[in-house]
Amino acid sequence: MNVLFAVWELDPFFKFGGLGDVARALPGSLKTLGVDIRVIVPYYKVVKMGRHKKAKVGKFQIDYAGKKATVEIWEVVHPYKQFTAYFLKNAKYFDKIVGIDTWGFFGKAVVEIIKQNVLNWQPDIIHVNDSHCGLIPLLVKTYALPVKTMLTIHNLAHQGKAPID
């Protein structure tokens, strides 16, 4: 089974709260059970790669907010749990950690990776975490992609509410 684990933080590269711990531990545990799990996360300016070996494994374009945007994909093997992590890089949308466009852009980029088969790997399930990744299931359905989605809400207090505009 192939699982793509979409999340907005991943310990030890960037950790804001408990979700970063979950993003490190759960994929590692599933990998030991034989699941081909890969984590996908924004490559914020504040991400600390340190001495971890990273490789640029892809570059693609998406349409977002009426404009073309380029996204780079950087791959790292998680130093503790040995699963593959993909970091999506785009200076305009991922320089800031918090922003409504950050999450919309991230969701669109994740779905375009699958739609365009950028990684030459397709998930059976996308496990999305919290409101940050909440658009992904809707976009999967909109594009009729042959992928199941699962949403985990880790903290109901953070619902991602924002103005409609």
At which residue positions do the language-model features occur?
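Catalytic cores of nucleotide-sugar-dependent glycosyltransferases that transfer UDP/GDP/TDP-activated
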Residues: M1-D165
